[in-house]
Amino acid sequence: MKLVATLSSPEELELAEKADVVELRIDLFDFSGARVDKEKILTCRRVSDGGKFEGDERERIEKMKRAFDSLNPDYVDLESDLPDSAFDFNCRIIESYHNFIRTPDYSELKGIVEGRRGDLVKIATMGKSKRDVETIVRILTNYDDVVAFLMGERFSFTRVLAAYLGSPFIYCYVGSPKAPGQISLDDAREIISRLG
């Protein structure tokens, strides 16, 4: 498992020294020209998926392609509802699904995982009940190359639990949280060292 620090500024890049991977959120800051000596995930999140990018899809994909050429990321994060043509990047693809209202049932999430076009699938849904925890655990135990967790303060533990169920990444923050229930990089590192 690798610790991913989600970044929204160059100052946070300095705070992410202990991260294994950095997620460069170009919807929050223009990282072009930034020197990053770690594995990188390039993300430009739409407003509907918890980000700040407000333009149309064509503009967003073009922005990502320009940033791709400048930053040379190891991964690009693309939403699961995009057409196949958007998945034309020469790197590993994280196909992501976000739901800030609820956690869909297992069969719907299973469809997302089994229909994936990316190398990894990231599922982040709003947690409301124990049943939601069960749904995410089922996805993680039945599939490989899946990052899946529940959003919300009450369910922040699922971010670490997911790593022990095979999730390749734990998304963390440095500076300030970028999503509901996101845990700090320092806290994640401490929890992992205590759990072994």
From Swiss-Prot:
Q: Which residues form the signal peptide?
A: none
Question: Keyword annotations for this protein?
Answer: Amino-acid biosynthesis, Aromatic amino acid biosynthesis, Lyase, Schiff base
Biological processes per GO annotation: 3,4-dihydroxybenzoate biosynthetic process; amino acid biosynthetic process; aromatic amino acid family biosynthetic process; chorismate biosynthetic process
**Pathway info:** Metabolic intermediate biosynthesis; chorismate biosynthesis; chorismate from D-erythrose 4-phosphate and phosphoenolpyruvate: step 3/7
Q: Which InterPro entries match?
A: Aldolase_TIM, DHquinase_I, Type-I_3-dehydroquinase
Q: Which reaction does it catalyse?
A: 3-dehydroquinate = 3-dehydroshikimate + H2O
Q: Where is the active site?
A: 98, 122
**Residues noted as binding 3-dehydroquinate in the record, renumbered to the chain:** 23-25, 45, 159, 182
What EC number(s) does the entry state? Answer: 4.2.1.10
Q: Where do transmembrane segments lie in this chain? A: none
Q: How does it assemble?
A: Homodimer.
Q: Which PANTHER family match?
A: 3-DEHYDROQUINATE DEHYDRATASE (PTHR43699:SF1)
Q: HAMAP family attached here? A: AroD
The record describes the protein's role as: Involved in the third step of the chorismate pathway, which leads to the biosynthesis of aromatic amino acids. Catalyzes the cis-dehydration of 3-dehydroquinate (DHQ) and introduces the first double bond of the aromatic ring to yield 3-dehydroshikimate.
Q: What is this protein called?
A: 3-dehydroquinate dehydratase
Q: From what organism does this protein derive?
A: Archaeoglobus fulgidus (strain ATCC 49558 / DSM 4304 / JCM 9628 / NBRC 100126 / VC-16)
